[in-house]
């Protein structure tokens, strides 16, 4: 497994790629301005981590807990936030595209000012009262599930560009995977 020192060295190089950090406890890590690609934070607890200005692709935060994390002006694509708990965060001016927030829970103050969310699934996501998502945050003013053809394309694309075939809690392939 990668040590904290090795991780910080990788961050210092400006690119964090092809890493599996499943189940790790990460505190006060500053990824600011990094390229973060093909990284798995599944079931991690991230506290006070800074992803401001990051370019993030194929990053999985599945079942992770994010507390007081920052994603200001981050560009996040093809990333997995399913069952993720996001508690107090800022996504101010972030661009979120082709992501899956199925059953994600956002609680506390989560700042979405001028964030753009497009081609993203918010199916069964829970937004607490401190989360202010406005229509102008949603690209084209529509969510993916409201446009079934687009949603189906997203599910098919997700299997090639995203973080892989969706599975449900019982590790079976989800019924709402595309055929």
Residue spans for each PLM region:
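Tandem repeat scaffolds
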Residues: 2-178
């Amino acid at each position: 497994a990668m040590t904290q020192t090795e991780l910080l060295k990788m961050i210092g190089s400006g690119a964090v790629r092809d890493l599996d950090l499943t189940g790790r406890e990460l505190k006060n890590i500053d990824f600011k301005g990094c390229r973060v690609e093909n990284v798995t934070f599944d079931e991690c607890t991230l506290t006070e981590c800074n992803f401001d200005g990051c370019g993030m692709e194929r990053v999985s935060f599945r079942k992770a807990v994010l507390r007081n994390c920052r994603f200001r002006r981050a560009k996040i694509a093809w990333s997995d936030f399913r069952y993720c708990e996001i508690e107090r965060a800022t996504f101010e001016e972030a661009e979120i595209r082709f992501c899956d927030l199925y059953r994600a829970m956002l609680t506390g103050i989560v700042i979405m000012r001028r964030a753009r969310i497009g081609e993203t699934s918010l199916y069964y996501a829970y937004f607490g009262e401190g989360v202010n998502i406005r229509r102008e945050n949603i690209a084209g003013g529509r969510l993916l599930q409201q446009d079934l053809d687009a949603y189906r394309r997203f599910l098919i694309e997700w299997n090639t560009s995203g973080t892989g075939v969706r599975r449900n809690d019982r590790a079976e392939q989800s019924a709402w995977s595309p055929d």
